[in-house]
Amino acid sequence: MSNNTIMLARWGMQAELERIWRICFDEEKRPTDFFFNNAFRPQDCLIYRAGGHIAAMVHMLPAAIAQDGKAVQAHYIYGAATLPEYRSRGYMGALLRCAGHVGLRRGDRFSFLLPASRGLYDYYAGYGYAPNFQTRFVTVSAEELRRISAGYSRRRVLLTYRQMNRLRGELLLKRDGSALWDERALAYADGINRRYGGARVCFGKAGETAYAFCRMAGPGLCEVTELMSRPETLPGLAANLLSAMPAQNYRIRLPGGGPLFEGRGKVSHFGMIKPLGGITIQKMIQGSNRPYLGLTLD
């Protein structure tokens, strides 16, 4: 009889789960510790036990999806990993199927994820996920940002996570199918970004706000992994970005079809989603405002 079991994790399993994380993601101790100290919850982690040991895991981080102007409960599949000696046995597929059942039982309407590589899109498609999210990648020179921010000087601003989340909701809630997070998720995204040498850059004036998460991606290149701003707040944010993270070029991730740097950049599928009941993918991708993922923690 097989001793293989799928179950929710329990407190006290962190050491074994951390070992899997570090082996599978070739991760250093500090970022690994940060996840398990700040984002891990056993009720959000499914494990596959084989022969008395944890062979694989998936984390189902609480999230939401925009639908008809409302936030609908969902989960984000994160940290999906199988130890090398247990791969190609179907353990991860079993966990993904189970995650759908567990999510539906707790009220989640969607499951979504960001494949670690292009080759994995086909793999996840086999478990019902579709490439719904789109991100526009725009590269902007420091010189262009200086022109945009002409007349603005750096103004030190630190928005609260509540302010950031409110702005994010205002910009994305009407973009059906987009991923929404809570303040806890924003705090985690900020913290893990800083552990990789990144920064949170903010702007605020007369009640209008903007923010960006950024990090250096190579010599002279700053990767802006999320930028939330209206056109009128972009100049002030650009001034603060130039000061906080000097670089020659800035590669910015933006929602597809948005007003910032309109018509520029390359639009790519960046994430997948699976409905757990109700709405179909086809309805969510109607219109010009393609669903946006963001805060992928990649």
Residue spans for each PLM region:
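Conserved acetyl-CoA pyrophosphate-binding loop and the N-cap/start of the following alpha-helix
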Residues: 86-98, 232-241
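Conserved GNAT acetyl-CoA-binding A-motif
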Residues: 96, 103-116, 246-256
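Active-site/acyl-donor-binding loops of N-acyltransferases
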Residues: 125-148, 215, 223-232, 239-298
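Amide-forming acyltransferase catalytic core, primarily the GNAT-like/NAT-type
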Residues: 130-232
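A short, internal acetyl-CoA/4′-phosphopantetheine-binding micro-motif in the GNAT/acyltransferase core
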Residues: 77-87, 224-233
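Active-site rim helix/loop that mediates acceptor-substrate recognition in acyltransferases
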Residues: 14, 19-67, 176-202
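Conserved beta-strand in the GNAT
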Residues: 47, 53-64, 74-81, 112, ...
